[in-house]
């Protein structure tokens, strides 16, 4: 197991003639909280997409929990993401016909470990224990976001983005 959950070395991302990321070097330890800040169009989303395996870098090295991401094909990146990284997107991606509890348990499905008690516990942690049987349309935007956070936390992953 690596000292760093996420590490980049001389990371670059180019879109044609446009350099979106230039010489990015970061090291993030497990349990560490960081903020990626910058103006609109500064590359924050591009960086997050690369760090989570949703995109690839033009050059440089990305080491995710000791694994060189460049050595992973698309299937390998998908598997790594499913097993190691909890994601909370700007768009919530909740299944509208599932309850809050079922949406959280969906993350467990990919690990073949369904633990309703754990799903209820993380919903309690994010302050939604009383809303577990509500569908997304019955929740406020903030509550929907907390369901997504619970869905990310219930996974066994080492990084939550």
Question: What feature does the model see in each segment?
Answer:
Residues 3-158:
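ABC family nucleotide-binding domain
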